[in-house]
Design a protein with these regions (language model features):
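Short, well-structured alpha-helical interface segments that form or flank functional binding sites
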Residues: 20, 39-42, 121, 125, ...
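Residue-level marker of regulatory loop/turn positions in helix-turn-helix DNA-binding domains and
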Residues: 3, 36, 176
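Hydrophobic alpha-helical interaction segments
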Residues: 135-244
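Short, charged/polar micro-motifs that form catalytic or ligand-binding hotspots
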Residues: 15, 116, 170, 174
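Positively charged, polyanion-binding regions of nucleic-acid-associated proteins
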Residues: 2-16
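Short beta-edge/loop segments at beta->alpha junctions of small alpha/beta modules
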Residues: 13-90
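Short gly/ser-rich loop at a beta-strand->alpha-helix junction or flexible surface loop bordering the NTP-binding
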Residues: 59, 75-154
Length: 244
């Protein structure tokens, strides 16, 4: 079978399934004659490069039809990043807004928080900087009790938290922000996300996979880093999401 024919058949197969592996498509195409797996792997790679397919895990593909998650950043958030970056240019950090989580929720909860995550050694310094320079109330490592008793999540404020090493990040307008995979794991683990845990978490993860491209390999690698890999796998299996 010519390469164009193989590629056409791959895309046809991809349109009938939400996700698939090399073995899946190899078994399907081999019904009309044996196809070399190396050739098939090469064609899959080319389709990924051409952005006709997405690789959403190790050896797991899907038709390119869902957007990537790109959190929006307000001018205020950009200014906060600039303040921190100018003061500590070598400090690794990540910044985003809680309002970006609302699209994933089933039961909407107000969240006007600006999250500033920095390397563990810099948390205190950045907290002190923002306490002095920002007009917003700034909290360091907030937990459930602090939020429940003292913080109105519907009002703008800043949470300063440690950034987990090797956390998956992306650049939004040259500003480091979390990937969707990072957020889905952090929601499970961080005490300030207590209100999104439990049954709501299932809705969030299900909506994330429905609305956006999610790299399950990246998700599970970070989940392992945070000690919640098995729990994440169990959730994916409960939602009938393919695990690589």
């Amino acid at each position: 079978m010519a390469n164009d024919g193989i590629r056409g058949n791959i895309l046809s197969y991809a349109s009938s399934d939400s996700s698939f592996t090399l073995s899946d498509v190899h078994s399907y195409l081999s019904r009309d004659g044996e196809i070399n797996r190396s050739t098939l792997r090469r064609q899959l790679s080319e389709l990924v490069k051409e952005r006709k397919l997405d690789r959403i895990g190790h050896g797991v593909y899907t038709l390119k039809k869902k957007p990537e998650f790109k959190p929006a950043l307000s001018e205020l958030t950009k200014n906060i990043f600039t303040q921190v970056h100018r003061a500590y240019p070598l400090l690794k950090l990540c910044i985003y807004e809680g309002v970006n989580l609302s699209q994933l929720q089933h039961h909407l909860s107000p969240n006007q928080i600006i999250y500033v995550e920095v390397e563990r050694d810099g948390v205190e310094s950045v907290f002190n900087l923002l306490t002095e320079c920002s007009k917003l109330k700034t909290y360091i490592r907030p937990n459930e009790e602090m939020i429940y008793n003292y913080i109105n999540m519907g009002e703008q404020a800043i949470f300063v938290k440690p950034l987990i090493t090797e956390a998956p990040l992306q650049m939004i307008e040259d500003i480091p922000s979390p990937t969707l995979e990072k957020l889905l794991v952090d929601i499970q683990r961080d005490p300030d996300f207590f209100y999104l845990q439990g049954h709501e978490l299932l809705y969030i993860i299900d909506n994330a996979f429905t609305l956006y491209t999610v790299n399950t390999t990246k998700l599970l690698r970070y989940a392992s880093r945070r000690g919640t890999k098995q729990e994440t796998i169990s959730i994916l299996e409960e939602l009938n999401i393919q695990v690589p």
